[in-house]
Amino acid sequence: VWAPFYNEGLINKYEFPFQMIHTETDFFETNIDYDYLIDNPPYSSKEKVIRRCVELNKPFCLLLPIDTLERKYISSLFRDRDFTIIIPKKRWKFINNGDKITMPFKSCFFTIGFKLGRQIIFE
């Protein structure tokens, strides 16, 4: 699993039953071998990140603000693909320097290629 944006975040404190890949390289110019991309990318470049993920043509899951669903590029990029949108029931709290922070917006998972079916899941 490639997590290109996690840097030195909280994810480092967990052990996974699969190999996590992180490189200190530019995501937009790096080509590495991986099976899945799962991450919480910088929201300031979300369109560029989504376009790059689609271009890489491998399964991905991105945690993004729910209002990303309203963007025109989403319908054009997702229209003919096996996508699933997973919407959590509650607004998530993120941990920053040990403090739980409620984000001012709701988030959801945008996925392509996980064979979950073409749907929006309210979870």
Pin down the residues of each PLM region.
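Class I S-adenosyl-L-methionine-dependent methyltransferase catalytic core
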Residues: 1-123
